Amino acid sequence: MKLWPSLAALSLLVIATGAHAADAVGEWARVDGKAHVRIAPCGDALCGSITWVRDPKAPGKVGQKVFYDMKSNGDGTWSGKAFNPDDGDEYTGKMILDGSSLVTKGCVLGGLICKSVDWTRIN
């Protein structure tokens, strides 16, 4: 009988974690209009792939995974890896969700130097 409260609490935790991760899932547009990215579940994390770029000379970027292994920190943020297709380098990545806005960061030197990109939800 004491097992039921534990199972109920665990079920709520799993549901809440899944719902929280789903909040960032969807299509996002860079505020500067340069690209769109789709955030979707991949395994036990979130990943983001480029779905559109404004620059007609860069169609090869479409389909590239630019965020991966983004695991929820439980507070509307995710930590993982970010890939910059412009320089081909991988960075420590972070996503911060605030309603219909998303900020992504790529950092080096343990987070001392970061570059941020602002996104808005488009679906």
Where are these regions (language model features)?
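Short, exposed beta-strand-loop hairpins at the edges of beta-sheets
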Residues: 92-114
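Positively charged n-region of N-terminal signal peptides that target proteins for export
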Residues: 1-5
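A short, compositionally biased
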Residues: 21-23, 76, 98-100
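Bacterial N-terminal signal peptides
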Residues: 7-15
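Central antiparallel beta-sheet cores of small beta-barrel/beta-sandwich binding domains
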Residues: 24-93
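Sec/Tat signal peptide C-region and signal peptidase I cleavage site
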Residues: 15-21
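Short, solvent-exposed mixed-charge patches
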Residues: 122-123
